[in-house]
């Protein structure tokens, strides 16, 4: 039976801000800083999806995250590969994956750890306004 989480310790673009439900793939520190800085002054919900190419539960969640992002287009969804942007992952202590961190005005307000789509939707509903 598979697990709904992986641990970072298990294995050692263009920026389209989403008003239409896309997930922004964060590919560089500069891109991350640009997105993060633009969200600091906003009451808009930022959902950071911490993932890795080797994370099975992350891959399983990817289509669900895209589906959820399309439903909640008032939130911004950003995917961060923990191996590519280790400093960002470290800032948010994204050790067990997938990890979904909810941020408003530059501050973490909640998180969901693991492949738990129902819990993810519940937290988005709770924090989107």
From Swiss-Prot:
Q: Which cysteines are joined by disulfide bonds?
A: 55-58
Residue span(s) of domain Thioredoxin: 6-129
Q: Name a GO CC annotation attached to this entry.
A: endoplasmic reticulum
The active site lies at: 55 (nucleophile), 58 (nucleophile)
Q: Does the keyword Disulfide bond apply?
A: yes
Site (Deprotonates C-terminal active site Cys) location in chain: 49
UniProt keyword annotation of Membrane present: no
Q: Which InterPro entries match?
A: Thioredoxin-like_sf, Thioredoxin_CS, Thioredoxin_domain, Thioredoxin_H-type-like
Question: Which CDD domains does UniProt cross-reference here?
Answer: TRX_family (cd02947)
Keywords annotated in UniProt: Cytoplasm, Disulfide bond, Electron transport, Redox-active center, Transport
- Compartments it resides in: Cytoplasm
UniProt-annotated site: Contributes to redox potential value, residues: 56-57
Q: What is its main location?
A: cytoplasm
Q: Which domain of life is it from?
A: Eukaryota
Spell out the PANTHER family in the cross-references: THIOREDOXIN, THIOREDOXIN H7
Tell me, in a sentence or two, what this protein's role is: Probable thiol-disulfide oxidoreductase that may be involved in the redox regulation of a number of cytosolic enzymes.
Q: What is this protein called?
A: Thioredoxin H7
- The source organism is Arabidopsis thaliana
Which gene is transcribed and translated to give this protein?
Answer: TRX7
């Amino acid at each position: 039976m598979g697990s709904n989480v992986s641990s970072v310790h298990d294995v050692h673009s263009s920026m389209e801000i989403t008003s239409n439900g896309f997930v922004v793939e964060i590919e560089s520190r500069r891109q991350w800083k640009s997105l993060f800085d633009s969200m600091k002054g906003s009451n808009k919900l930022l959902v950071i999806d911490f993932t890795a190419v080797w994370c099975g539960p992350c891959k399983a969640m990817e289509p669900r995250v895209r589906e959820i992002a399309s439903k909640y287009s008032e939130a911004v969804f950003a995917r961060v590969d923990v191996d590519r942007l280790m400093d960002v992952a470290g800032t948010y202590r994204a050790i067990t994956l997938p990890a979904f961190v909810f941020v408003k005005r530059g501050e973490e307000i909640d998180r969901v750890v693991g492949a738990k789509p129902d819990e993810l939707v519940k937290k988005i509903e709770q924090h989107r306004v």
